[in-house]
Amino acid sequence: MDIGVHVLGSVTSNENESLGLKELIGTKQDRSGFIGEDCLQRSLKLARTTTRAEEEENLSSSVAAAYCKTMSFHQGIPLMRSASPLSSDSRRQEQMLSFSDKPDALDFSKYVGLDNSSNNKNSLSPFLHQIPPPSYFRSSGGYGSGGMMMNMSMQGNFTGVKGPFTLTQWAELEQQALIYKYITANVPVPSSLLISIKKSFYPYGSLPPSSFGWGTFHLGFAGGNMDPEPGRCRRTDGKKWRCSRDAVPDQKYCERHINRGRHRSRKPVEVQSGQNQTAAAASKAVTTPQQPVVAGNTNRSNARASSNRSLAIGSQYINPSTESLPNNRGVSIYPSTVNLQPKESPVIHQKHRNNNNPFEFGHISSDSLLNPNTAKTYGSSFLDFSSNQEKHSGNHNHNSWPEELTSDWTQLSMSIPIASSSPSSTHNNNNAQEKTTLSPLRLSRELDLSIQTDETTIEPTVKKVNTWIPISWGNSLGGPLGEVLNSTTNSPTFGSSPTGVLQKSTFCSLSNNSSVSSPIAENNRHNGDYFHYTT
C-alpha cells in the first residue's frame, strides 16, 4: 500500500519528481524480478499526451501507475514488445503494443531443427504458413526478454494453445510435405526421411512396424497388444516359451498349431480312393440262403459219364462262341466259396459251335448242351469233378469215374441262384426221351476263379409248378468248394465244407425240393423240360 501512495504522490507533483519515483519504483520492481522501466516510460508518455485539465492528468497517471503495480505483483505479460532488454527508449516507444497490428508469423524451423533456407520454406506445406503462432502466456518463472514467458518445449503442447497440432506433429508434417515434394518430382525419397518417420511412430525403434499399420497407433492400440515379433507363430506355453516357426500368411499360428484349438470333427474327412472301394466291392460276394436238398439213392450200377464244366466268377462272363451277342448282359449271383484253380487245369470241351440254340447260365451262353457222343439212356447225368484233368490238360476226351468209386462218395447239396437277363433257349428234347447230352460250358476265360460242377441232371417232367433249380456241389480236399477229387484211390476222403449240408449218397441222386427260381426253368417248362443239377 505504501508503494501505491508513493506512486500516486510522485505522479501528481511534477515531472522533476519523476526521477525519485523512477528510483523508488525501480527498486521495488527489481526486487520482485520485474523491470519497471517500461512502466515508467508508459506513465510518462500518457502524462505528456493528455491535453485535459490537471485533475484528468492526475487521474490517468494514477491509473497507469496502479496498472504497473498490479503487473509487477502478478508477473503479468507487458503490453510492449522489445527485442532486447538493453534497447533504447526510442526503440521501446516504437514497439509499444497496438491492438490493431497483426501479429507476425512465428517460424518454427529454428525449434524443430530444420534449415531456415528459402528452399526449405518452399518445401513446406502451404497451410503451415497460415496457421497462427501460439500466444504468449504467463509463467511463474523461467526465461524471456522483457518479462515474456514462453514455453517452447519440443515434447509437449503449448499450455495455452488451442491449435490442432503439437510441435512434434508440426515437424512431422513438414517432413511429410518434403517427402511429397520428392514424390511429385519423381525423385527417390531419401531413406533418412522415411526412417525418421518410422521411428517416430513405432515404439520399438529397431523393429519394423507391425502389420496393423500406423492407424492403430494413433487410435491407442500400439502398446502391449502389439506383437513384438510379427510373422512368428504365437503359440506359447503361457510362460516364456514361444513357437519358433513362421506363421501362416494372414494367420496367427504356424501350420502345426493352426488347428490345435479346433475340434476334430471340423477337419475334412478323407475320402477313400476309387481303388479301395473297387477292391472292397470285389472282395464282398453276395450270397443267398442255401437250402439243403435231400437226395435219394438210386441204383449203383448206373453208368456215369463225366464232363468238365468250369464256372468263372468275375465282373464279366463271356462265352468265346457268343462274344458278339448283345444279350450276354445280366445279373448273376454266385456263392463266394468257389474253387481256385489255374486256367489250364479245366479241360474245355467246345463242340457244335454252330448250334443255334445257346444255353445261358447266368449271363453266360454256351453253344449247346447236346452231345451225341456221350448220349446215355439213363434218367439222369451228372457233372463230376476230375483231378486227372490237370495231368491231361491237353486231352479233350471225357474222364469217367468207375462204378466202384461212386458208392461211398459224400456229396454236398446246396441251392445256387441263377439269374439271367435274356431268355435262354433250350435244347431239342421234343420226344421226351431219357437221353442225356453232355457238353462243357465255357463261361469265362479271363479270371482264375472257377467252379467245377458235377454231372448235370436233365430230367424230363410234365409242367411242374416248382421252378427251383438245385445244383449239388461236390466237396473238395483243399478248399471249401471246387477242388478236384483224387481219382487214384478207391475210396477218396473229402474234407467237410463250411457251407451247405453234407449228405452221404451216391451220384445218382434225385432232388424234388428246391428253393431258387430261374427264368431258365420257366422257359423250359413250356418245352416240358426240367433242369435238375445235383451231385
Swiss-Prot record:
One function term, GO molecular function aspect: transcription cis-regulatory region binding
Compartment(s) of residence: Nucleus
Positions occupied by motif Bipartite nuclear localization signal: 232-242, 260-267
Pfam families xref list: QLQ, WRC
Positions with biased composition (Polar residues): 272-291, 426-437
Regions of compositional bias (Low complexity) in chain numbering: 299-308
Annotated region described as Disordered, given as residue ranges: 260-308, 417-437, 514-535
Native source species: Arabidopsis thaliana (Mouse-ear cress)
Note: Overexpression mutant display larger leaves and cotyledons, as well as a delayed bolting of the inflorescence stem when compared to wild-type plants.
Residue ranges occupied by any QLQ domain in the UniProt entry: 164-199
Protein name, as recorded: Growth-regulating factor 2
Keywords for the protein's UniProt record, in alphabetical order: Activator, Nucleus, Transcription, Transcription regulation
Gene: GRF2
Predominant location: nucleus
Family that this chain belongs to: Belongs to the GRF family.
